[in-house]
Amino acid sequence: MSVDLDITGGVARVTINRPERMNAVDLATAARLEAIWQQIEGDPSVRCVVLSGAGEKAFSAGADMKSGDKAKSGVQYWADGNPMGFGGITFRDTLKVPVIARVNGFALGGGMEMVLGADIVIAADHARFGLTEARVGRLPLDGGMVLLQRLIPRNIAAGMMLTGRMVPAAEMARYGLINAVVPAPELDAEVDRWIADITACAPLSLRAIKAMMRRTAQMSAREAAGARLPELIEALNSEDQHEGVAAFNEKRAPVWKGR
């Protein structure tokens, strides 16, 4: 399989497994990713997703330009559109659980666009990030051009895209894109710490928070505060919101049911 999926203990680990191609995404890999996202969306046991690339060199180098797939022209690719973004994740608003990008190396082009679709980014200190499309005569069409400038200072985003430069993880952390940068041997332990904290929270609360953040980002604060999203109402009416208060008062760990 070009992408591996393991679901254990409520955590779905999605690993692009093409290390010989720097985990670049060809048509078959893109189709496999889409099938995986749909499977996860239909599995209520999943509480968190970890997206990574196999090996130690690359998270993903983006589109596989040597795959042998019938190539589209740039304008054909743009005209066809990709509503979910690169790898089916950049713009995906139907995946309601937190997504961690475990960045174990280069995240370039579409690989970086997948990072932009994550909720939390954990990177090894040797990781490098870049929207390098202009260096091969293409554009960051699957989310890079519109999202990067919303997530880091505009002039920094412009500098990256207008030069195609690759930026070290520590620098991207200073710009606010990365939650944690750790030495490579500590990457999995750091990811596990984030998973533990996420799964300690009520699942419906996290779904509501993610939905509110995603869907109200372009609203005024007053408009956003007044949004009545279904996920918000579900969380506020859930058994878990009673369980959380009871557990706090009884000085015990809550037992979440996700309902």
Task: Show which residues each predicted segment covers.
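Crotonase-fold acyl-CoA enzyme core
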Residues: F91-L204, I233, N237-S238, H242-A246, ...
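A generic local structural motif
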Residues: M1-S2, E34-Q38, M84-T90, L116, ...
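C-terminal alpha-helix plus adjacent terminal tail
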Residues: M1-A12, D43, E56, S67, ...
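An acidic, glycine-rich surface segment that forms the CoA-thioester-binding/catalytic face
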Residues: A30-R32, Q38-E41, M65-N104, V136, ...
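Short, active-site-adjacent cap segments at secondary-structure transitions
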Residues: E56-S60, L108, G130, M213
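Conserved CoA-thioester-binding segment of acyl-CoA-metabolizing enzymes
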Residues: M1-E56
